């Protein structure tokens, strides 16, 4: 499993000028067919506890921030199987999360997302190896 998390300059394009953040990462674990992404060290940047994401077998993403559940997001299917549209939803009125999913020909699943926290845009990506796909695509 490969993970990446990086801050994004508000004036730059989303990926073009993103730089790595080495002291902030997230850990992915599986519990009862649920993928849980828990961010580490975000409290060093924001005076709040870490952010946690859940992705369950019903393809619903739940976002919790500072122990408050803001939004439940469900994937929007495209015309083809495993083809998804990006989704944008408000978080607490001012913050947003944007995310997309893709699966390649080797059944490698990639989750891309952006989170706006305290006026800073963060981007992340997680790649899940084929041996973990059974937890996702039931």
Show which residues each predicted segment covers.
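Surface-exposed, interaction-prone regions used to assemble/regulate multi-protein complexes
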Residues: 1-138
């Amino acid at each position: 499993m490969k993970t990446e998390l990086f801050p994004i300059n508000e004036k730059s394009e989303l990926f073009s000028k993103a730089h790595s953040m080495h002291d902030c990462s997230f850990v992915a674990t599986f519990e009862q067919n649920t993928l849980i992404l828990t961010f580490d060290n975000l409290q060093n940047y924001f005076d709040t506890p870490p952010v946690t994401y859940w992705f369950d077998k019903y393809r619903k993403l739940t976002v919790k921030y500072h122990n408050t559940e803001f939004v439940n997001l469900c994937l929007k299917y495209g015309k083809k199987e495993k083809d998804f549209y990006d989704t944008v939803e408000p978080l607490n009125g001012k913050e947003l999360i944007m995310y997309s999913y893709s699966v390649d020909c080797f059944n490698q699943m990639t989750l891309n997302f952006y989170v706006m926290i305290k006026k800073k845009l963060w981007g992340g990506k997680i790649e899940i190896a084929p041996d973990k796909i059974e937890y996702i695509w039931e």
